């Protein structure tokens, strides 16, 4: 395999522009490309005009709602309604830009997209996305204190039943709190006392 014509970029002032990189027997032409140093195993080549590529304009795309615009604690969730999605400034530059930052390696740069600045957007008079409560779609936001906490007491009152008479000869059982319907006793054979009732009926004695 012939030696590659890639030059290591250990110093920027000695890096000549490359026109071709040969792999195997098939020459492949890459115009205006630079090769990474030999410490990178994959021999990846980048465009040397990445500075112009990173400065290209893109449309404004705001994906997250700003919590400062909606601070009502009664609503748990809020929907983000888009205003003007593609907002551009008067100088034909969008509110979202991509900037190039140098990595730890001196051979490559990474493009990082910066979010929209709401201050400059408001000063230019453009409409940005805002957070609106979900109640605008027809779903009301109930207050936090709307949960009823008396289910436990009602259920407890309807399930407790005891015999009020202390006379062992008495066979009538009545509920402690008159919330559930009156329990009905089943007919039993003479001489057998029914036990205390439960909610909705009586227990038959075990034979």
UniProtKB/Swiss-Prot annotation:
Highest taxon of source: Eukaryota
Database matches in Pfam families: PMG (PF05287)
Q: Does the keyword Ribosomal protein apply?
A: no
Q: Which UniProt keywords apply?
A: Keratin, Repeat
Look up the record and report any one GO term of the cellular component aspect. Answer: cytosol
Region (Disordered), start-end ranges:
184-207
PANTHER family assigned to the protein according to its UniProt record, in alphabetical order: KERATIN ASSOCIATED PROTEIN 3-3-RELATED (PTHR23260), KERATIN-ASSOCIATED PROTEIN (PTHR23260:SF8)
Q: What is this protein's function per UniProt? A: In the hair cortex, hair keratin intermediate filaments are embedded in an interfilamentous matrix, consisting of hair keratin-associated proteins (KRTAP), which are essential for the formation of a rigid and resistant hair shaft through their extensive disulfide bond cross-linking with abundant cysteine residues of hair keratins. The matrix proteins include the high-sulfur and high-glycine-tyrosine keratins.
Q: How does it assemble?
A: Interacts with hair keratins.
**Protein name (database record):** Keratin-associated protein 27-1
| Originating species | Homo sapiens
Q: What is the lineage of its organism?
A: Eukaryota, Metazoa, Chordata, Craniata, Vertebrata
**What gene name is given for the protein in this entry?**
KRTAP27-1
